[in-house]
Amino acid sequence: MSQKVFISEDDEYLFGQGTHYDIYDKLGAHPSEEKGKKGFFFAVWAPNAADVHVVGDFNGWDENAHQMKRSKTGNIWTLFIPGVAIGALYKFLITAQDGRKLYKADPYANYAELRPGNASRTTDLSGFKWSDSKWYESLKGKDMNRQPIAIYECHIGSWMKHPDGTEDGFYTYRQFADRIVEYLKEMKYTHIELIGIAEHPFDGSWGYQVTGYYAPTARYGEPTDFMYLINQLHKHGIGVILDWVPAHFCPDEFGLACFDGTCIYEDPDPRKGEHPDWGTKIFNLAKPEVKNFLIANALYWIRKFHIDGLRVDAVASMLYLDYGKKDGQWVPNKYGDNKNLDAIEFFKHFNSVVRGTYPNILTIAEESTAWPKVTAPPEEDGLGFAFKWNMGWMHDFCEYMKLDPYFRQGAHYMMTFAMSYNDSENYILPLSHDEVVHLKCSMVEKMPGYKVDKYANLRVGYTYMFGHSGKKLLFMGQDFGQEREWSEKRELDWFLLENDLNRGMKDYVGKLLEIYRKYPALYEVDNDWGGFEWINADDKERSTYSFYRRASNGKDNILFVLNMTPMERKGFKVGVPFDGTYTKILDSAKECYGGSGSSVPDKIKAVKGLCDYKDYSIEFDLPPYGAEVFVFQTKKTKN
């Protein structure tokens, strides 16, 4: 039975303060009942409107049928309309102070019309029955910094197309659920990061120009279908991260821009309210109601849809007032510099509320500069994020791996530099969609050499990534050697898995993921030197790297030896920290992975003798583009 929904004076007060964190239960369109009649309660923030009406298919889009009432503060307009059913299309018809009539989609709508339509649609989120309690039980008491996190970044509409021949070829959320769960479990990813979920009008924006912040896109079904997808992922032990875009919004006239005839979501000064590079509007974070809109939105996805994390897009564009702008296109802050004080306060507020309420929620910053303390807590003057994408590592990795092996010795430092600042933040190593578009080539096509060399290069490169400190992220298709760049218009080239090299690559990444999750040395201590030690970081003449990851309990330490050239290194000697047997757990040169074969023994006994400043060493023939991974135990000493 529907309950009566209404806006109280307390609601208005808290919203005006920017602290009404469940305002999404009041603003928007909600099933309600008044005087025994069922219908929908509509509410919209439009403080400068002269008048507001609700128009929809239930009243023939009649401009005069349903006039809303202004609240006591004058900022919010409300109306209960009996008889409105679930699934009805509607908009707010706002009359501006100058007489203009603006047809606006509901900023707080939970569901929207499928593009090219842009109306909002009524729905009821309360009907879905969740069954993911075991997932939440499994998270209790866990420090996510000390857990394995391996993220599969995915765009639903282009992951796989339906063979039914329809124009879009989209699988529904429910159809996608069954397929993606099977894939993620097979590969052993811990999380999926979904891009393009919040409603957006243009497919080519990939979901980064949003019009419906509270509406899962209708491209793949209804909101309850999206709930089903998350529920299924949780039931199989897979976390869900959502791409979230608080930096800017779509300028389309039916959306948030100039919403009530004035700029209530953006700053009216284009130097503050517009992003020239992207052609988008910038949220005015000085306004409490705008901050409330965004922070409540984050909580909405967590509470209503059981989202486990938010990857926050374009953080740098928010922190710097002059980001992507020329002189004269931006306004300094009150101190005369380029720091966006409102954005800094917003991130501290956002993370304090979200992570203070839900400690295991992953808030992840895509921050591309050296802004300090992104993952430090707000009480230490940090922004409070759980993790930050390590864009510096990503850049150096891609630039190095693209080089002809002959020139790699001159860029040897590019693969070691990231460890020099690794302890400054809690990092995720991202190889995301941004690296495989706009003529940047897919990951495998970035690699030098003939086809077999490209795959060998990528195998050793990925091994370096999984051995390096930091959580992991791979974009879809890059785990099996997708050769074309990503396009939102087509599915991944799954047919490539008919080829030995691609099957080998998929199996190899699957093995990397298995090893990563199995051995705590690879994830327990990611952000200080206690978990990582170079054996030899300076062998630039041969372009080899050796290091080991140290387990906190002294057991199952992992040694990595990498050869970044096509030259076999006969009798390769590497220093090791302890006596004992080193057991091989991964060999990139194996034929089953697409390699040419390897003679590296499964077990190698350490020999006493100084090497690489270590008291012991092991010796073997290091294959061309070889990645050799060993597990070993700390030798116990008697007291």
UniProtKB/Swiss-Prot annotation:
Q: GO terms for CC?
A: cytosol
- Tell me yes or no: is Metal-binding among this UniProt entry's keywords: no
**Does Transferase show up as a keyword for this record?**
yes
Matching entries from InterPro entries are given as: A-amylase/branching_C, Branching_enzy, GlgB, GlgB_N_E_set_prok, Glyco_hydro_13_cat_dom, Glyco_hydro_13_N, Glyco_hydro_b, Glycoside_hydrolase_SF
Kindly give the CDD domains that the UniProt entry links to this protein: AmyAc_Glg_BE (cd11322), E_set_GBE_prok_N (cd02855)
NCBIfam families assigned: branching_enzym (TIGR01515), PRK05402.1 (NF003811), PRK12313.1 (NF008967)
Record function comment:
Catalyzes the formation of the alpha-1,6-glucosidic linkages in glycogen by scission of a 1,4-alpha-linked oligosaccharide from growing alpha-1,4-glucan chains and the subsequent attachment of the oligosaccharide to the alpha-1,6 position.
Relate the assembly described in the record. Monomer.
Q: Which protein, by its recorded name, is this?
A: 1,4-alpha-glucan branching enzyme GlgB
* Taxonomic classification: Bacteria, Bacillati, Bacillota, Clostridia, Lachnospirales
Q: Gene encoding it?
A: glgB
